[in-house]
């Protein structure tokens, strides 16, 4: 009988403790503060490969939608996904549409100006809402930033 009483007490304690609030969890307010104060994230895309570019844009969009400060930096061959009409043989129309949507939804896109010129494009060829990276703008992107390069 004593055994059953101890088991019953133990089960009662376990059930009772399970209803206590988790002091290690985050509520919505603390999650929002964490994201707001988090370091900025820069996705640096150097490739015009549609698969690689799609992954970058998907990741950047998901983090932006979660509230993080995300910038997409396009350089070298990656500038192709930041222009209105990339070279047709690259088949980047869907990727360019996703970058356009990223910008429309509040994402920031910076296109390397030198890389743009080397690729044969003019500043007015970039997607609406994107900006040309300059010596003043680009270094500021990296201040306290987490950089993910593809």
In which residue ranges do the predicted regions lie?
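Secreted/extracellular ectodomain signature
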Residues: 23-40, 45-150
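Bacterial N-terminal signal peptides
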Residues: 8-18
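Positively charged n-region of N-terminal signal peptides that target proteins for export
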Residues: 1-4
């Amino acid at each position: 009988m004593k055994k059953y009483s101890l088991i019953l007490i133990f089960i009662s304690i376990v059930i009772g403790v399970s209803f206590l609030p988790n002091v290690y969890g985050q509520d919505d307010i603390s999650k929002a503060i964490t994201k707001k104060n988090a370091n900025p994230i820069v996705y640096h895309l150097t490739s015009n490969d549609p698969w690689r570019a799609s992954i970058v844009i998907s990741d950047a969009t998901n983090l932006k939608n979660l509230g993080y400060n995300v910038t997409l930096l396009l350089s070298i061959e990656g500038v192709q996904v930041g222009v209105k009409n990339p070279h047709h043989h690259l088949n980047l129309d869907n990727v360019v549409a996703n970058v356009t949507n990223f910008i429309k939804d509040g994402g920031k896109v910076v296109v390397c100006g030198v890389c743009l010129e080397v690729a044969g494009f003019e500043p007015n060829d970039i997607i609406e809402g994107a900006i040309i990276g300059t010596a003043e703008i680009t270094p500021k992107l990296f201040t306290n930033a987490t950089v993910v390069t593809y």
